[in-house]
Amino acid sequence: AAVDMLQADALEVHLNAAQELWMAEGDKDTCGLLANLVQIRDAVSVPVIVKETGCGIAAEQYELLLEQGFTAFDCAGAGGTNFPAIEAKRQGVELTEEFAAWGVPTCWSLLDAQQTLPQNALLLASGGIRSAGDAARAFALGADAVGITAPLLRLVMEQGVDAAVDYVHSLAEGLQKYMLLLGCLTPKELRDVPLIVTGETRDFIASRGYELAKLCRWRRG
């Protein structure tokens, strides 16, 4: 009913198990979660996007969702807003260090998607996207679009809507500059730009058994 009332073009259903664990009113029973997702998808007439909430989607979850016929995802990886920390603070408790670091970073979730999703899947990147450079890297890793929330909300609250609009324009202009410098006419063409991978992300690629040289030369078409 809500989809029809809003004349929505799509429905985004979020996964937030980690957040629920630290919510006083949280639902800690995840039994039947996948079946519920399928039921929702089958009940609506618009595409359903499966979205995480700051903990990322790993290859194993992509595969499980693909098996159930889902083809649109928002990885919403770790690196941005930490919802378990927000819920813990709301209750006046401290989130321990081991759980404060829980989640798949957005970059790693995109790399897992590279190796898992078919080319016709829709892949959105969010979670720690703060700059034009972040957006360019996400597009280079195969994202079809990027999502940004926290900086916009902060600007609206502290400086007003106009400041948030200026921020979006600045991001768009910055992305265009990256595209020009890299010889790309569209964000999608950033996927053809060779990558240099170092540090923990290089270790992640090795631990996953992905072929580094091939991945650095080609991503989702």
Task: Tell what function each PLM region has.
Residues A1-S126, A132-L155:
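Alpha/beta enzyme core
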Residues E97-L122, R130-G221:
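Alpha/beta catalytic cores of nucleotide-metabolism and tRNA/nucleoside-modifying enzymes
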